[in-house]
């Protein structure tokens, strides 16, 4: 932690306030406001994104839906690491654009998602709740307005113990002081829609922070540019930035958003003495020798442990621990020799530890949580002396798989992810099951610091990198397609890829099929001698004689049990690799298809999987490159333009004339979803007759 940040966080110790910012999606948040709240006002700041952005588009790859939500979760965490707040979610799924609140609430399930918002309020105990959107059509999107409705209703009931009483096993009711709307710039709001002047307060959030060497505009630009899958890179702004808080419910603020809220140590019994010690630490702080204030920090830490207020005790305990680590120059980590392992496998975990200060510190012990290793040491740490200790360990039988917790089970319908563990609901990620605990004595006080066991590796271009240590099933089974369509009674090849997570895995694999369907052979044996080895096998699947549909599931059996999960890793340079293990299954459909034409020319768009679906039905699909455009297009019965192709494919403006000639001669051309942002400038427009692409959307998916 740089010394400027240390001093900033020292000052933050004296602030006992909390704010919750609520919106619908990743990238809805006002990153300048969040940065200002966290680093200028120094209150505990949290962003609750009702969804993970699963329904958006993907400008960096082909992942959509759940996998896009996984990417955008990591992008939000990267953003929060820059601008400072904590990140949370509900179980709601972003199902795409919605024109009104009622539709959104019906699909999400209002009572469930409202309960998730109440749960987060009771956990975070915000003094102020800030809505990004109003609860009405001005929000411009049903998800947006729904987030405003949820925030306001949750504010009204989160302090009522009769509402969602099952939560009270873990949290207490909490009543925030007020709800405000962080409104849009009034210059863009119609006069009739503007709130009365007395109902809002104005703040300048574009100020400069000399401890960080940046303004909040600049910090927020770096933060917002983490939304790379949405193409949200923005320039750094500088200068004054007026923002507005419009009063909605609760006690009205007259001058400051925290009016009437004591955000000093006076709000907790025994806090005044702690404030005095922290002020001494701030006064004595020396950027050339941060360890000189550790004695003050430890003294404050001991007093915090005796606070009656559990919420602020836990919060300030965590803040003090982070500062003590920074000021002592402590660094510690625990790295396995493999990035993944399977149940029962033996690996090595190496702990690395160093202290970069002259302050006396004793290492008491190292404990590997979840791996049954506990080593007592009582070692005095020297200044800048690196210590490595390697522990041979065995992964426990039945150790839980490492994957995004909200994707471990199938969704509860279209609008809600299934999460049965109440304490996990809303967390961006589950804490690592396998951790290393380092126990130190500092200034006669024992500290136990935990860190996840995490794999470290070096990329020759990007340098040192980290990825989560994964527990995998000993055998994973991936099916090649998500859907198999049979237009006749002919058998189709179904390819299965088996992958081992450890050495010497053998057994058999088979398909579970709907009634009337058949696979040949009935099962196939496999024997994988090496870790990460793959083997491909093919079943010939024959459909039912009648039109029908159903699911096929892949099942592998070994001496250690039955396995039915595939493996999928999402990897991009801007996020850590994310691995999940979905149930290995596919939809099978037998139906009578009437073809009119068979040859399709296809222009790929962003994240495009439509060509594979067309081939699955039985069409011959040719991807149109420069070579095909220089040939006769009349051989195609239709030409299909992929999603956002006119936004992402610059070459289209050069080929548009030839495409229109194809249409003029009677050819069929289908253009899928395009947006007016970054649309290619094409002479004559996108079609045979003039038209403009608006921002209006067709959203009834089942029409």
Task: Mark where each language-model region is.
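The feature marks non-catalytic terminal segments
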Residues: 5, 157-331
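Aromatic-Pro/Gly-enriched surface loop or interdomain linker
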Residues: 562-642
């Amino acid at each position: 932690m740089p010394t400027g940040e240390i001093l900033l966080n020292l000052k933050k110790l004296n602030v006992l306030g909390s704010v919750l910012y609520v919106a619908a999606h990743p990238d809805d948040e006002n990153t300048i406001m969040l940065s200002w709240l966290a680093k200028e006002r120094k209150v505990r700041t949290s962003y609750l994104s009702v969804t993970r952005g699963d329904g958006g588009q993907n400008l960096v790859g082909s992942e959509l839906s759940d996998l896009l939500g996984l990417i955008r979760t990591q992008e939000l965490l990267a953003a929060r690491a820059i601008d400072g707040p904590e990140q949370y979610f509900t179980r709601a799924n972003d199902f795409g654009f919605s024109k009104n609140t009622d539709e959104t609430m019906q699909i999400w399930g209002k009572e469930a998602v409202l309960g998730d918002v109440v749960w987060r309020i009771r956990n975070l105990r915000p003094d102020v709740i800030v809505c990004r959107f109003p609860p009405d059509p001005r929000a411009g999107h049903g998800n947006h307005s729904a987030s405003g409705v949820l925030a306001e209703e949750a504010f009204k009931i989160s302090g009522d113990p009769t509402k969602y009483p099952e939560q009270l096993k873990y949290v207490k009711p909490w009543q925030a002081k007020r709800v405000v709307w962080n409104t849009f710039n009034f210059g863009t709001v119609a006069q009739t829609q503007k709130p009365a002047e007395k109902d809002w307060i104005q703040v300048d959030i574009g100020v400069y922070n000399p401890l960080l060497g940046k303004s909040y505009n600049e910090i927020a630009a770096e933060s917002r540019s983490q939304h790379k899958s949405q193409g949200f890179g923005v320039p750094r702004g500088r200068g004054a930035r007026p923002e507005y808080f419009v009063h909605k419910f609760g006690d009205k603020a007259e001058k400051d958003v925290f009016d009437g809220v004591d955000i000093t140590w006076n709000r907790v019994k025994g806090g005044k003495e702690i404030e005095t010690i922290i002020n001494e630490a701030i006064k004595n702080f020396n950027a050339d020798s941060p360890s000189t204030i550790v004695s003050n920090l430890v003294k404050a830490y001991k007093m915090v442990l005796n606070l009656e207020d559990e919420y602020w005790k836990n919060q300030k305990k965590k803040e003090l621990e982070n500062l003590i680590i920074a000021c002592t120059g402590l660094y510690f980590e625990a790295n396995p020799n493999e990035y993944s392992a399977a149940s029962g496998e033996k690996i090595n975990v190496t702990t690395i530890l160093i202290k970069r200060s002259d302050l006396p510190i004793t290492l008491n012990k190292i404990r590997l949580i979840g791996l049954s290793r506990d080593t007592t040491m009582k070692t005095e740490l020297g200044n800048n002396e690196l210590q490595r200790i390697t522990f041979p360990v065995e992964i426990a039988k039945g150790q839980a798989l490492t994957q995004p917790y909200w994707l471990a089970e199938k969704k509860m319908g279209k609008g809600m992810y299934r999460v049965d563990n109440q304490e996990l609901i809303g967390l961006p990620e589950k804490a690592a099951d396998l951790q290393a605990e380092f126990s130190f004595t500092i200034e006669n006080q024992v500290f136990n610091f935990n860190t996840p066991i995490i794999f470290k590796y070096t990329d020759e271009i990007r340098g040192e990198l980290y990825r989560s240590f994964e527990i995998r099933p000993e055998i994973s089974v991936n099916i090649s397609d998500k859907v198999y369509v049979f237009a006749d009674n002919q058998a189709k090849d179904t390819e299965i890829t088996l992958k081992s997570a450890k050495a010497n895995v053998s057994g058999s694999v088979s398909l579970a099929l709907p009634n009337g369907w058949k696979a040949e052979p009935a099962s196939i044996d496999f024997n994988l001698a090496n870790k990460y080895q793959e083997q491909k096998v093919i079943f010939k699947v024959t459909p039912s004689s009648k039109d029908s549909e159903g699911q096929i599931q892949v099942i592998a059996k070994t001496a250690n049990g039955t396995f039915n999960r595939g493996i999928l890793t999402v990897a991009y340079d801007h996020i850590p690799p994310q691995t999940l293990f979905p149930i290995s299954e596919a939809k099978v459909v037998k139906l009578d298809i009437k073809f009119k034409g068979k040859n399709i020319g296809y222009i790929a768009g962003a994240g495009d999987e439509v060509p594979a679906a067309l081939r699955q039905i039985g069409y011959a699909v040719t991807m149109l490159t420069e070579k095909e455009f220089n040939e006769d297009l009349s051989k195609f019965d239709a030409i299909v333009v992929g999603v956002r192709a006119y936004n992402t494919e610059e070459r289209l403006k050069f080929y548009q004339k030839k495409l229109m000639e194809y249409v003029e001669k009677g050819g069929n051309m289908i253009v899928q979803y395009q947006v007016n942002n970054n649309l290619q400038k094409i002479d004559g427009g996108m079609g045979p007759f003039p038209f403009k692409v608006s921002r209006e959307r067709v959203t009834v998916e089942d029409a």
